[in-house]
Amino acid sequence: MYFSSLCKFLPISEKEKIYLNIVKKRFCKSNIYYNNNNNNIINYNKRGLKFYPFCNNLKKNINFVNINNKKGINFHSINKERKMASEVPQVVSLDPTSIPIEYNTPIHDIKVQVYDIKGGCNVEEGLTIFLVNNPGKENGPVKISSKVNDKNVSEFLKDENMEKFNVKLGTSKHFYMFNDNKNSVAVGYVGCGSVADLSEADMKRVVLSLVTMLHDNKLSKLTVVFEINVDKNLFRFFLETLFYEYMTDERFKSTDKNVNMEYIKHLGVYINNADTYKEEVEKARVYYFGTYYASQLIAAPSNYCNPVSLSNAAVELAQKLNLEYKILGVKELEELKMGAYLSVGKGSMYPNKFIHLTYKSKGDVKKKIALVGKGITFDSGGYNLKAAPGSMIDLMKFDMSGCAAVLGCAYCVGTLKPENVEIHFLSAVCENMVSKNSYRPGDIITASNGKTIEVGNTDAEGRLTLADALVYAEKLGVDYIVDIATLTGAMLYSLGTSYAGVFGNNEELINKILNSSKTSNEPVWWLPIINEYRATLNSKYADINNISSSVKASSIVASLFLKEFVQNTAWAHIDIAGVSWNFKARKPKGFGVRLLTEFVLNDAL
């Protein structure tokens, strides 16, 4: 404004020179249109300059010299009059319009058979692995006590040959030899440590050692002999983890999928009292795919997974499972006055999409449950941009992990078909981006329950979307509301990468979640909601601020914020920010699918 007022006293010719100099120095680099005949010249006419108000008085076309003398600067813009080719908005025609999802994976083709170990184990082909421990001796020698129905292999596995190796957790060895039928077989072990009862973390280390051997060897058959004691839940967890870790996600590679990968066709398991474990096999396969389905959504980059394509994937899933579904668009959300949720998505080119799938069992419904997943398909932080070291902006495609867990649970529930329940799978999906339309720090927005919220930080967006989703869930008249979200990075500091935190307003419901945590082997720790911290959310101008005035206990304070949007319904909030992503393996865990499914199947009634 100051510069323009000075220029009005200059002659027109001098003013034009100053304007042109500014355009050349400040704006040309982002708006260069090359002449095909001469890459050093661009034609910048009045139409191009009209977007800069101080250039509107220029009366002629002007040829500018290319100031950087470099060939090829891509500049993409969206024309308001452009008609989109598909439901998913695109900047250029090459932009993806759907999320590639594998429904039939090689794991589904593996034939699994469970045998009783009392009859001895056969070593016929492929790889045979003994899971061994030595209670009380962490580095104790390997001793294989199972009967082996093969003389050559049995001779090799005698104590004098194996005692040079130890059972330290995760250690493994395998050897090639000929069996009695002169067939080449691989036989080995995985150490399970010194404890009699393995934890889920211990079992995962065992499985990872086993998967490494499978990936290193092209085999058609795997046989696992359990010389350790496991209950049914841990046995199922072994199978789920084996299937999940064995499967590789190569959807976005240009080469043929799994061109160098040959999956086994048969899995044999020897264990005591085999009949009690057989029923867990198919359930494990369902849990595996529910988790892998969620993982596929989380792993999909944000140019593939956006609010529209994610809602399309939810509809596709519902149709496959015969679930009821509806997707609410911006118009319906405006009618529901979801101002908090709508504000977060204002900066994105993709419209908000609210996912609502419903499973209704046949017969009497004893419990109605709403599962609510946070669904931010990419979180830039908004105007409070994730620019600081450690903000992990490159990983923010995973901020819809809660939504993915809920949809993965929908797959499991729709497949296993529990009785006497009605389940609502909900997610307020949007993208938190920076643009001229984005909501700003300091804005005051109104949620669907009428509460006004001062936006203290645009990077505290998840709680705003969940606020309206929780209000929506309670209006469904459900008995329980459980939300699951990558809500606060503080969970990494409080519980690390192994445990999720659970908060809530109902002790009975939280205990059900904790029990589901044990049976699903997805660890959850009960954290308190401390009401005296509510004062840190006070706002001078609105009913509440979306961020605390203190940096302390931010996960608890975030739960206090959510609590404001649930009135009379039992509610639990599960924060999975620390456990959703496997940082070492650089892939999603799909955390929460088994936890929520176990809750629905066994603990909700």
UniProtKB/Swiss-Prot annotation:
A Gene Ontology molecular function term of the record: metallodipeptidase activity
Disulfide bonds: none
Gene3D superfamilies linked: Leucine Aminopeptidase, subunit E, domain 1, Zn peptidases
InterPro entries associated with the record: Leucine_aapep/pepB (IPR011356), Macro_dom-like (IPR043472), Peptidase_M17_C (IPR000819), Peptidase_M17_leu_NH2_pept (IPR023042)
pH dependence: Optimum pH is 8.5. Active between pH 7 and 11. Optimum pH is 8 for the cleavage of the Cys-Gly dipeptide.
Glycosyltransferase found in the keyword field: no
Gene Ontology terms describing biological process: peptide catabolic process; proteolysis
Binding annotation for Zn(2+) 3: 394, 396, 399
Effect recorded for residue 533 to A: Loss of catalytic activity and impairs oligomerization
Enzyme class: hydrolase
Top-level taxon of the source organism: Eukaryota
Catalytic activity: Release of an N-terminal amino acid, Xaa-|-Yaa-, in which Xaa is preferably Leu, but may be other amino acids including Pro although not Arg or Lys, and Yaa may be Pro. Amino acid amides and methyl esters are also readily hydrolyzed, but rates on arylamides are exceedingly low; L-cysteinylglycine + H2O = L-cysteine + glycine
UniProt KW Zinc keyword: yes
Reported impact of residue 394 to A: 7.5-fold increase in catalytic efficiency. No effect on hexamer formation. 1.7-fold increase in substrate affinity
Keyword set, alphabetical order: Aminopeptidase, Cytoplasm, Dipeptidase, Hydrolase, Metal-binding, Protease, Zinc
Family of the protein in this entry: Belongs to the peptidase M17 family.
The protein's assembly and partners: Homohexamer composed of dimer of trimers. Both the identity and concentration of metal ions available dictate the extent to which oligomerization occurs; Mn(2+) and Co(2+) induces oligomerization, whereas Mg(2+) has no effect, and Zn(2+) causes irreversible protein aggregation in vitro.
Name of this chain's protein: Leucine aminopeptidase
Organism (species): Plasmodium falciparum (isolate 3D7)
